[in-house]
Structure formats: structure tokens, C-alpha cells
Amino acid sequence: IVVEMDPIKTSFEKWAKPGHFSXTLXKGPNTTTWIWNLHADAHDFGSHTNDLEEISRKVFRAHFGQLAIILIWLSGMYFHGARFSNYEAWLSDPTHIKPSAQVVWPIVGQEILNGDVGGGSRGIQITSGLFQIWRASGITSELQLYCTAIGALIFAALMLFAGWFHYHKAAPKLAWFQDVESMLNHHLAGLLGLGSLSWAGHQVHVSLPINQLLDAGVDPKEIPLPHEFISNRDLLAQLYPSFAEGLTPLFTLNWSEYSEFLTFRGGLNPVTGGLWLTDTAHHHLAIAILFLIAGHMYRTNWGIGHSLKEILETHKGPFTGEGHKGLYEILTTSWHAQLALNLAMLGSLTIVVAHHMYSMPPYPYLAIDYGTQLSLFTHHMWIGGFLIVGAAAHAAIFMVRDYDPTTQYNNLLDRVLRHRDAIVSHLNWACIFLGFHSFGLYIHNDTMSALGRPQDMFSDTAIQLQPIFAQWVQNTHALAPGSTAPDATASTSLTWGGGDLVAVGGKVALLPIPLGTADFLVHHIHAFTIHVTVLILLKGVLFARSSRLIPDKANLGFRFPCDGPGRGGTCQVSAWDHVFLGLFWMYNAISVVIFHFSWKMQSDVWGSISDQGMVTHITGGNFAQSSITINGWLRDFLWAQASQVIQSYGSSLSAYGLLFLGAHXVWAFSLMFLFSGRGYWQELIESIVWAHNKLEVAPVIQPRALSIVQGRAVGVA
């Protein structure tokens, strides 16, 4: 049996002793530093004990608490939809009425935030996309939202109970946490497989019929309730005749019978401007089948299937030494290493989601709600950025706390660490190259523009730098439905090309996005900022245990201010310091992405369409010619758009104005820390000097980082 019964008795005594988890903090405060350390270490389970089983149980228990908080938060969202929103009004006229789910009380004049959202209601216009997802899932009344909110609270209570139960009553043993094959099978088949299958089932039996009727203009109050569709097959058969045949076509392999509600059309629904919900139901069913198969691939009690340890240990090539040997032990004993990998993958996936939300808008009427589109893109980019920086943070914690050099000899990890100087100096060169060349193209354009020589600028109308590879990818995908997917009526996304335009309620939902010289230029800025972020984060991980500047870093821990008073040049050199220096560049990278997205969409996609079919874009298609100079970015995007936000203070949009101001305050605050990163720069310089020595081109005069005082002088200037 893999659980231990009644390991820890339930008591509230410890709650009365702040800092009970630490010998030093439990004594109580001497200075104000105590409260900071209390917050820093309360959830750092690795510092409370060295017992991996106990740490694992605490993390496992915390996950249930986290789920409870998420469910309570979601319940609040649904409750607002049920109690304070105009959802039913929006549902009846989604092209004219704006979504609102919060009405501000008249306290100290805050009621200015309540704008006219149409349909006779006033409130804050929301940009979370919840109304659109509710419609897609078949919610037709505020009562249904209310019931869902109550359901979420019940689930939250269950999660809190589970957290208590699996720590105090039946706690899993370490072996259970380390049984990776069983975990993979259950997560793949259970969470992803059955999860997707149940969502596909909900879509087919509830969402599709309700949305079909809504699209046809049926009054939401006339539509049968969800449980009626589930219990009464005749209702579904009226909309999809093949429902009358039940499961016979499934078992007789006559699957094409189901093609009424499991489609492969591509493109967007012209009524709602969202993906065809019959396509998404088909997609989730297919995903479910794939993951149910994947959940049977790993070897557990029966002697068949994959063993991860075997896979990793036999995975070696001619140039990689011991290959992946030793990684299995790392990933089953260091949860930081495990978390780092998961954060890196989930962060990348979140950014992929950001780009799919606008190019393949999944919910009805999402594509014509431009504020929501912008918010969802921004949200997913930020979340992805945070997760990726978090990956580097936990990789560095793994290096400091969990890495044992004696067990890792000549495997991939060891080999990467041994040639870290080459990695960092090459990456540094790539950053310098990208920075000078990408900005150089802009500076050239600014100069030529100032000298009145437009024919010498890099632009679509002068010296062209067309993104030919991106255009080739677009073209291939635009042509795909005719060849690789003969039954599809349109390509996966209208953005690829092919001339299709979908407009809903006189607004453009989506159209082919042209790429030109302006995009080529800004994409190289993206490449530059991403590489700088990677340089900082990777340097933090590779030099987390030691460097030429501080050979004994591993003994100082993950975060330390300076290596003692006698070594002033060693400040801001810990692995933790690299995290916030990396965050700064992540913010820079993400800002350029969001600027690019919002201007490009307003210039080339979003806008209104006349009865004659003439499209008028919000900023009139000025991206291609304006964004090719720094001056154009400053004047036609930053100033042109910020001035509206800055002047919003007397209107219902003032909250956005304040958030805009606050976000810039946060960014400016982060600048302050950059200018004193003395040790960080010295450490980087020593890697680069190593590269020069190796090529025998090292200068006689030693390069040295600015002192903290010099750095601050530069910062002030």
C-alpha cells in the first residue's frame, strides 16, 4: 500500500506560532527583516526539512489548496455573471451590446467607471472573454451561471477537504510520487483523455444544439434547457438527424454518419466570427482518443510498455557522452528540476495560445470584441513570459540545492555545464549582432527619412526586405485545404491568406494578414529581446553553482546580496538576481510584441465594413509605412494611442488610464535595479574575456565592469 495512515495529527497550535517552520524565525521578531523572511520562506518547503517525502506531501497538499482558491475565484466570476451582469441582454444582441459584469457603487465618485454598455444597462465593460465562452458552452440564462457558481464552491470545499485528508489522514509515500509511469498513464488518460472526452461530449450534447438555435436567431428563453437535450434524444435528432441512429454507426465503423456534428470545415462561422463549434467538438474527440491511447503506453504492473529510465539511459548519440544517463534520478528526486521543465513547456504553450486566440478565435463573437482580443493576447503573453522566467528560476534553485556533481559525469547536463563559457559568449555575440543590426535598420530609416530620401529607406515601396519565409509558410497553409485536406472548405486560419474576409455586425472579424518589410524589421527586434532574456536567464542557471568571480557560489545559496564586505564587486550576482534582471528583459520583449500586435491588428485587420464591402481600418493601414522608423513608432503609435489613454481620466475608461500609468511605474522601478548589477556584469565580462583568450585576441587592458557608483551615475544621466 502506498499511503501512510494518520501520519500527522490535526491541530491548530502551530498557527499561533508565526515562523514555526524555521528554527530562527520561530523565536519571533528582532527586526523588521523578520516579516520579510516569514513571507519568503513560508512556502519554501525545501528549507523546512530535508525529508523528500515530507516535502512532496506538503507540495501535494498545497496543490489542493491552490485548486480550491482557483475554484472560489472562478465561482466569483460566475456569480458576477449571474448577479451583476447584462449577459442575457448581450446574448440577445451580441453585436451591439457590450459585456458588463460589474456595477461600481457610488462611493467617492467611483461610479464614473460605469459606462453605457448598451441595452439600457450601465456598468464596467469587461474584456475577459467570459461572455463568449459562456455562449460557446451553451449557457443561456443567468440562473445557469448561478448554479455553476454554487457548484464551483462545492468543488472548492471538496478540494480543501482532500488537502487535509491526504496530509493528515492518508498521506502518499515517497514511492507514489516517484512512480512516473503510473503518473503519466493516469494524467494522460485521465486528465487529458477523459477530460477532453467529457468536454467533447458536453459540446455535442449541449453546446452544439443550443448554439445552432442561437445562431438561427431563436430567443434564448425558447431554447430547451441543457438537461433536456441530454435526456431527450429526439430534440437532438431534429437538429442532427443522425442522432436517431445512436451508437450503431460508431460500432459498424460507419463514422461518416456523424459528419453533421463532427465536421472538418476550417475557417470561421460567418454568423458569429468564431471557429465552427462542430470543428472544435471533432477536435476534442480526436484529442481525447489520442490521449487515451497515450495513457496506455507506459509500463506499470504488467511487463509491457515504455520505461522512462530505460528510454533516458539508452538515449545517447555519437557526440553526447553518457547522454541522458542520470536525468531520471534528477527528475524523480528534485521537484525544482521537474518544475523548471514543466514551466518552460507550459510557458511556451501559453504564448502559442496567445497567437491562436486571434488567428483562430474559438468562441462566438470574440473576434469582433477588439478590446477583449487585445486583453486576451496581452494576458497570455504576460503569463507565458512569467512562466518561462520561472522555469529559469527553478532550474537555478535545482542547480544550487539539488544538483550533485558526483553523480553526473559526462552526461548531457555535465557537458553543457562544462562548456558554459562557450555558450554564454556565443549567445552574447548573437545578442550584440541582433541588437546593432535590428536597431541599425531602424536608425538608417530614420536618417533617410530626416534627409528626405524615401527612395533609400527599407520599406515596401523602396528597398524591400520582404519576410519571404513567413510569406511562404502563409501561402502553403492558405493552399492546404485543396491538397492536404480536400474536404475542408477553408484553411485553418483566415490569416494565412486566400482572400476570405469574415465580418460580423459591420465589423471585421478576421481577414488575411499581409506581412511586409515593417514586420521583418520588428521581428528582428523580437529576436533581439528574446535572445537577451535567454542570455540573462541561462547565465543565471549555468553559473548558479560557481563562476570565476565567485567559485563557491553553491555554498552561498540561491540568493545572497554580495559575497561579503571585502568583495564589493560581487553584488547582484546570485542566481536570484538573474531572475529579476531576466524579468526586466522579459518585460521589454513582451512590450514590443504587444505593441506590434495591437498596431498591426488596428492597421491591417480590425475595422468597419460598409454595405458596399469597403473596409475602413481603425488606424487606416498606416503600419507598413509608419512603423519602419523609430520616429514612426513614437509618433504614430505610442503618442497617438497613449494620448487617448492619458485623456481618459474623466471618463468611464479612467481605470484603464490608471493601470496604464501604474504599469509604467512598475517598469521604471525595475530600471533602478539594473544600474547596480555590478557583479552580474563582471561575471559576464569574465566569460567573454575567456572567449578572447581562447582565440588569443585578448586585450592587454583588462575590461572591468562599472562600479556601483559609476553605474548609478549612468542611471541618473
UniProtKB/Swiss-Prot annotation:
Cellular compartment(s): Plastid, Chloroplast thylakoid membrane
EC number: 1.97.1.12
Binding site for [4Fe-4S] cluster: 562, 571
One Gene Ontology MF term: 4 iron, 4 sulfur cluster binding
Binding site for phylloquinone: 681
One GO term of the biological process aspect: photosynthesis
Cofactor: binding details: P700 is a chlorophyll a/chlorophyll a' dimer, A0 is one or more chlorophyll a, A1 is one or both phylloquinones and FX is a shared 4Fe-4S iron-sulfur center.
Listed transmembrane segments: 59-82, 145-168, 184-208, 280-298, 335-358, 374-400, 422-444, 520-538, 578-599, 653-675, 713-717
Keyword Oxidoreductase: yes
Keywords: 4Fe-4S, Chlorophyll, Chloroplast, Chromophore, Electron transport, Iron, Iron-sulfur, Magnesium, Membrane, Metal-binding, Oxidoreductase, Photosynthesis, Photosystem I, Plastid, Thylakoid, Transmembrane, Transmembrane helix, Transport
NCBIfam families for this protein: psaA
Assembly description: The PsaA/B heterodimer binds the P700 chlorophyll special pair and subsequent electron acceptors. PSI consists of a core antenna complex that captures photons, and an electron transfer chain that converts photonic excitation into a charge separation. The eukaryotic PSI reaction center is composed of at least 11 subunits.
Family: Belongs to the PsaA/PsaB family.
Name of the protein described by the UniProt record: Photosystem I P700 chlorophyll a apoprotein A1
Organism: Cycas revoluta
Top-level taxonomy: Eukaryota, Viridiplantae, Streptophyta, Embryophyta, Tracheophyta
